[in-house]
Design a protein with these regions (language model features):
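Carbohydrate-active catalytic/glycan-binding domains of CAZyme proteins
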Residues: 1-148
Length: 148
């Protein structure tokens, strides 16, 4: 194991890396590139804060920089199979960061921010419906948003 001060280090220091890149539980990761920076988020089930935001310059060395959701709704206080933030999608469009995710019992939620290191908006239910997971937001050339 490549460890430094008890911390897992995937970067071998010679231009190569060792798997796993992240020695942690970040299920269903989604990554975007904004300029020279990469940002990642992952599913959150009963753990808070929720929707972790990680940053990297090389997709090997990642740092946890924020959480998009500081408190999940009360229904997440007790573990329930299928309950939680499923496969979030992080996107950057027109100067804003967005995260969309599906809760299979309720529908698709969204949160956004102008500053990925700052506060994120309250969660907004954008599409009600059961079984909606694995969202993929896109914007067309006219700026209209779609969820695929």
């Amino acid at each position: 194991m490549n460890r430094t001060e008890g911390k897992w280090i995937a970067d071998l220091g010679d231009g190569t890396y060792k798997n796993p890149i992240l020695y942690a539980d970040y299920p269903d990761p989604d990554v975007i590139r904004v300029g020279d920076d990469f940002y990642m988020t992952a599913s959150t089930f009963t753990y808070v804060p929720g929707l972790p935001i990680l940053h990297s310059k090389d997709m090997v060395n990642w740092e946890l920089i924020n959480y998009a959701v500081k408190k999940l709704p009360d229904r997440y206080n007790v573990p329930v199979h299928g309950c939680g933030v499923w496969a979030p999608a992080i996107r950057y469009n027109d100067g804003k960061f967005y995260i969309y995710y599906g809760d299979p019992d309720i529908g698709i939620f969204m949160t956004c921010t102008d500053d990925i290191y700052g506060e994120w908006s309250d969660l907004v239910l954008v599409k009600e419906g059961k079984g909606l997971i694995d969202t993929c937001p896109i914007w067309d050339d006219d700026g209209k948003a779609y969820i695929v």
